[in-house]
């Protein structure tokens, strides 16, 4: 009998250990097009009212993975090529998912993160401060994003198979720099000594495979702003991380057009708050001298202060950095590579979520430096003076400087005309001088969120912390350490913590309390005051412990429903017209008869307004290669890196417009006979929309 008991216990022990070594999940990945109106709508990111879309360089996509454990616990994570995420948008996605799947998906187990591209159409956030430079809410942007976000999760769900998840990491050194190094230096020296760099250089990858080890997808997190494309860009772009995703997907979806194919590869945002891709550093535009370290200003006559990337222009910089990120991810996926350090993810799936009313949050936190318990509280949302100064990725307007800790009577007068802060607000935010008292502004509706979304997704021994803002480098490091320690203390397991930035709702930035004192751009944009980061540390520690204990928490107060109060100054398309003796689709400028490698093809069509039809999951044009006498094959689309689509009005009163299509012929281009086809819709002056098509004559691409 004793031997039987020992054998049974041994069997249980072996079974437990085997469970740690290998775990079977249901895994699925999906992708969908979320490209909004590419023309006449401002882009979201730089808050530059002049940055109005004029066409497409690359389409933007949403990419999802779904994981379910053996008990049926399920989570969904989405990385969207968008500036950030809004709660109204997430709520609409959940509504559509529940109409299809019932309560399988809900607010607690779905996380939607933005890559932070600054080159996609805005107007979807439903808070005035974030939509004001877009001239308000844009229903067309909102709808295409809501449907695409829903579709990518649906496709991941429909693709669920038994599979495994592997985690791996690598160091990528030549992609990011800290754009506020003087703020970073405010953090304690003993803390900084624990890290080699002032930005996170680790790329973390989750690889999804089926039980035959066939690769399904790979999601990569790396801390870098998607701002290789600067605020002069007018073409829809997924920027550096989006290009990296296109390269990764091209590798594992051979002979497929961008955005097509079963393999899904994503590069997701992390604690990128103070992290720039413009690795050549900030310089004065005229003199070439370095900018002032504290204020990021240049002396009179030396030009503006801005940073640049490693390429000769923003397109090449985007390409270079995207390639470096893709190469790092490919190295991890190549099992024969020295970079491959993959280990299997094991354990159950859990999730937890809570809405937190930040201005009314009161708590306490232990300060390891002073070894005392500090009281913490939130403030009404407010933006500081340095917010208006912009960053070295995109300088602001007027004479504002980063690092400003004093106010100005003139700007205070302007501020108070909009909404005046109370004396309590002013004291609460010190040393930030308040430029916009957004928490007190209510006309025509809420300017910034007061209620935030805090969420954790646990997939085995990996925890994804979904944060509603842009954490700086050290702010993210502290949060990761806090969550890891809490999970270890309660669950007794060592976890890998991933920060997913700009998730579920957007509330600008979060810096450490020390960085807050410097009041550079990121600190001025930390909207809930100097204790913002401490509150998040408190909340996420509590949520981690509750999740590890399988406890439920109070849902918290829901953000307000604002769909019915949205305003917009954007007009729709009135009508389209064309010059006499032409028609829509007429090729005004034909290609040359012959081109060589590294040359650019340009053609021009008489066109309708692209806002008439977004051609979602389709394309405004195709570049086709002749296969034989009866067959042409699509070689490139408007989602391809090698192409650009530029639209412009030629007569506003008569509704005339033209479409320029550019194709850069790369060394990888096959020689042969090509032609370009443009598809569109025009809006008739008496009503209705009608399709049209135009086709160039054929031309030859010579062998190199």
UniProtKB/Swiss-Prot annotation:
Similarity annotation:
Belongs to the neutral ceramidase family.
User: InterPro entries given for it?
Assistant: Ceramidase_alk (IPR006823), NCDase_C_sf (IPR038445), NEUT/ALK_ceramidase_C (IPR031331), NEUT/ALK_ceramidase_N (IPR031329)
Compartmental location: Secreted
Extra remark beyond the main annotation: Overexpression rescues retinal degeneration in arrestin and phospholipase C mutants, probably by facilitating membrane turnover and endocytosis of rhodopsin in photoreceptors.
Q: Which residues are glycosylated?
A: 230, 362, 550, 598
Name the EC number(s): 3.5.1.23
Which named protein is this? Neutral ceramidase
Question: So which tissues is this one expressed in?
Answer: Widely expressed in different tissues but enriched in neurons at all stages of development.
Q: Which residues constitute the catalytic centre?
A: 276
- GO molecular function (one): N-acylsphingosine amidohydrolase activity
What catalytic activity does the UniProt entry give for this protein? an N-acylsphing-4-enine + H2O = sphing-4-enine + a fatty acid
Signal sequence span per UniProt? 1-23
Q: Does the keyword Coiled coil apply?
A: no
Which UniProt keyword terms apply here? Answer: Glycoprotein, Hydrolase, Lipid metabolism, Secreted, Signal, Sphingolipid metabolism
Which effect does the record note for changing residue 264 to M?
A: In slab1; induces embryonic lethality
Q: Name one Pfam family in it.
A: Ceramidse_alk_C
Q: What does this protein do?
A: Hydrolyzes the sphingolipid ceramide into sphingosine and free fatty acid at an optimal pH of 6.5-7.5. Acts as a key regulator of sphingolipid signaling metabolites by generating sphingosine at the cell surface. Regulates synaptic vesicle exocytosis and trafficking by controlling presynaptic terminal sphingolipid composition.
One GO cellular component term noted in the UniProt record for this chain: presynapse
Q: Which GO terms describe its biological process?
A: ceramide catabolic process; chemical synaptic transmission; hatching behavior; long-chain fatty acid biosynthetic process; photoreceptor cell maintenance; sphingolipid metabolic process; sphingosine biosynthetic process; synaptic vesicle exocytosis
Q: Which domain of life is it from?
A: Eukaryota
Main location class? secreted
Give the enzyme's main class according to its UniProt record, as a single word. hydrolase
């Amino acid at each position: 009998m004793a031997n039987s008991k020992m054998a049974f216990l041994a069997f249980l022990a072996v079974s437990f250990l085997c469970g740690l070594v290998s775990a079977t999940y249901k895994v699925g990945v999906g992708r969908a097009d979320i490209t909004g109106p590419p023309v006449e709508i401002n882009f979201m990111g730089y808050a530059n009212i002049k940055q109005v879309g004029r066409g497409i360089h690359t389409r933007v996509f949403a990419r999802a993975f779904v994981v379910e454990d053996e008990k049926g616990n399920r989570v969904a994570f989405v990385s969207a090529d968008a500036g950030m995420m809004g709660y109204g948008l997430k709520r609409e996605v959940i509504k559509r998912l529940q109409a299809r799947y019932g309560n399988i998906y809900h607010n607690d187990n779905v996380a939607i993160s933005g890559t932070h591209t600054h080159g996609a159409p805005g107007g979807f956030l439903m808070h005035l401060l974030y939509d004001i430079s877009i001239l308000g809410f844009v229903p067309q942007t909102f709808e295409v994003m809501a449907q695409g976000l829903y579709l990518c999760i649906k496709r991941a769900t429909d693709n669920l198979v038994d599979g495994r998840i592997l985690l791996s990491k690598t160091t990528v050194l030549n992609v990011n720099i800290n754009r506020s190094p003087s703020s970073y230096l405010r953090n304690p020296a003993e803390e900084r000594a624990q890290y080699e760099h002032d930005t996170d250089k680790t790329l973390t990858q989750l690889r999804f495979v089926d039980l035959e080890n066939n690769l399904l997808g790979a999601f990569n997190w790396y801390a870098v702003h998607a701002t290789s494309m600067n605020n002069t860009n007018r073409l829809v772009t997924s920027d550096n991380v989006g290009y990296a995703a296109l390269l990764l997907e091209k590798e594992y979806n051979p002979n497929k057009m961008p955005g097509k194919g079963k393999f899904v590869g994503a590069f997701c945002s992390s604690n990128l708050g103070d992290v720039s891709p413009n690795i050549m550093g900030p310089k004065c535009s005229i003199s070439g001298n370095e900018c002032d370290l504290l204020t990021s200003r240049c002396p009179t006559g030396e030009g503006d202060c801005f940073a640049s990337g490693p390429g000769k222009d923003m397109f090449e910089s985007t390409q270079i950095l995207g390639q470096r990120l893709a190469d790092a991810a490919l190295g991890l996926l190549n099992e024969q590579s020295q970079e491959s350090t993959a280990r299997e993810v094991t354990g159950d799936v859990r999730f937890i979520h809570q809405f937190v009313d930040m201005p009314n949050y009161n708590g306490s936190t232990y300060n390891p430096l002073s070894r005392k318990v500090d009281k913490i509280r939130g403030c009404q949302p407010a933006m500081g003076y340095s917010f208006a100064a912009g960053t070295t990725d995109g300088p602001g307007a007027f004479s504002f400087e980063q690092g400003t800790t004093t106010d100005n009577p003139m700007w205070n007068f302007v501020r108070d005309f909009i909404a005046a802060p109370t004396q309590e607000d002013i004291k609460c935010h010190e040393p930030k001088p308040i430029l916009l008292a957004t928490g007190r502004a209510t006309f025509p509706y809420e300017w910034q969120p007061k209620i935030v979304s805090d969420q954790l997704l646990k997939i085995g021994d990996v925890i994804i912390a979904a944060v509603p803002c842009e954490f700086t480098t050290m702010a993210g490091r502290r949060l990761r350490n806090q969550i890891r320690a809490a999970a270890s203390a309660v669950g007794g397991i060592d976890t890998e913590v991933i920060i997913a930035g700009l998730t579920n709702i957007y509330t600008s930035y979060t810096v450490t309390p020390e960085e807050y004192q410097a009041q550079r751009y990121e600190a001025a944009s930390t909207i809930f005051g100097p204790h913002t980061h401490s509150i998040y540390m408190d909340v996420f520690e509590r949520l981690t412990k509750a999740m590890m204990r399988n406890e439920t928490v109070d849902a918290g107060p829901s953000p307000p429903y604002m769909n019915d109060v949205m305003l917009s100054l954007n007009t729709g398309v009135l009508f389209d017209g064309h010059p006499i003796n032409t028609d829509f689709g007429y090729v005004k400028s034909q290609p040359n008869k012959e081109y060589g490698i590294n040359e650019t093809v340009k053609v021009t069509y008489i066109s309708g307004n692209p806002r008439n039809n977004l051609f979602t999951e389709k394309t405004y044009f195709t570049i086709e290669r002749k296969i034989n006498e009866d067959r042409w094959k699509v070689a490139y689309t408007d989602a391809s890196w090698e192409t650009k689509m530029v639209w412009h009005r030629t007569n506003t009163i008569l509704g005339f417009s033209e479409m320029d299509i550019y194709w850069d012929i790369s060394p990888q281009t096959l020689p042969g006979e090509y032609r370009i086809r443009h598809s569109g819709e025009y809006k008739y002056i008496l009503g209705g929309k009608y399709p049209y098509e135009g086709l160039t004559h054929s031309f030859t691409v010579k062998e190199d």
